Amino acid sequence: NFKQIIKMIQCTNTRPWXNFLDYGCY
């Protein structure tokens, strides 16, 4: 689960929040 949190942070750092679910960053 911790790795998912790190991945989520990395995704939000490179992707706009609006596209959070569009890129499957969860």
Swiss-Prot record:
Record keyword Disulfide bond present: yes
Localisation per UniProt entry: Secreted
Post-translational modification: Contains 7 disulfide bonds.
GO function terms (MF aspect): phospholipase A2 activity
GO biological process, one term: phospholipid metabolic process
Record keywords: Disulfide bond, Secreted
Expressing tissues: Expressed by the venom gland.
GO cellular component: extracellular region
Annotated family: Belongs to the phospholipase A2 family. Group I subfamily.
Name assigned to this protein: Phospholipase A2 homolog A1
Species name: Micrurus pyrrhocryptus
Taxonomic lineage: Eukaryota, Metazoa, Chordata, Craniata, Vertebrata
